[in-house]
From Swiss-Prot:
Gene responsible for this protein: Sgs3
Region spans: Disordered: 47-225
Species for this entry: Drosophila yakuba (Fruit fly)
Superkingdom assignment: Eukaryota
Residue ranges, compositional bias (Pro residues): 58-67
Biased composition (Low complexity): 47-57, 83-225
Signal peptide positions on this chain: 1-23
Keywords, in A-Z order: Repeat, Signal
The protein's name: Salivary glue protein Sgs-3
Amino acid sequence: MKLTIAISLASILLLSVAHVAQGCDCGCPTTSPKPCQTTVPTCAPTTTTTTTTTCAPPTRPPPPPCTDAPTTTKRTTEKSTTRRTTTTTRQTTTRPTTTTTTTTTTRRPTTRSTTTRHTTTTTTTTRRPTTTTTTTRRPTTTTTTTRRPTTTTTTTRRPTTTTTTTRLPTTRSTTTRQTTKSTTSKRPTHETTTTSKRPTQETTTTTRRATQATTTPKPTNKPGCGCKSCGPGGIPCGSCPKRQGLCTELNNLLRQLERRVRECVCGQPVWLL
């Protein structure tokens, strides 16, 4: 904006100086010449065209011929001062200022420096020690529950020997045969929801002994088996089992017999046993 104002002021000063120069007497005839044409400045404010018309010099009459008698001629010189009225017509054309900014970007060629760096890469591979994980499986403990076989106890009672002594000459020995019936009963099992019933096997053992003529033995003070007195504190014979096992076994037999009697003799259902 300041640049435009400065340029316009400079052009005005130039025009005023030019018009002052044109107002002087140029020696033209008295006829008023046509006013000099002044070009209207174009729209460009920076260019001012000034046309200055220079008038031709006045033509002087030829001198008179020379005579013997000098004649004195008085020349009356009239100075006509003609002031020219300079009419400056300024046409101010206001045009929209179109500022065209042309940005020319000149890219310099990019000079790429290729620097080849030789990089020595030393790769150190450290192998970790191989960790061998030994998984030791515990041996599978197989618990084998062995049920004791049903012990069939055959109780053989010795037949009672009745010796009848008669004065008759004939001595008769009466041997009573006794049949011992051994009942095999079930071993008590832990009852669950399902009660299984084992078949009861009956073992009948018939022992026949030969008839012998018996003699009444004399009473002795020693026990028959040669053992010490029986009881909790006594020493069992060698053929007898251990007392703890024998007690358990006899209790089981008693329970089995009771169950058998309730089931088969009394007729109680299984779920009540």
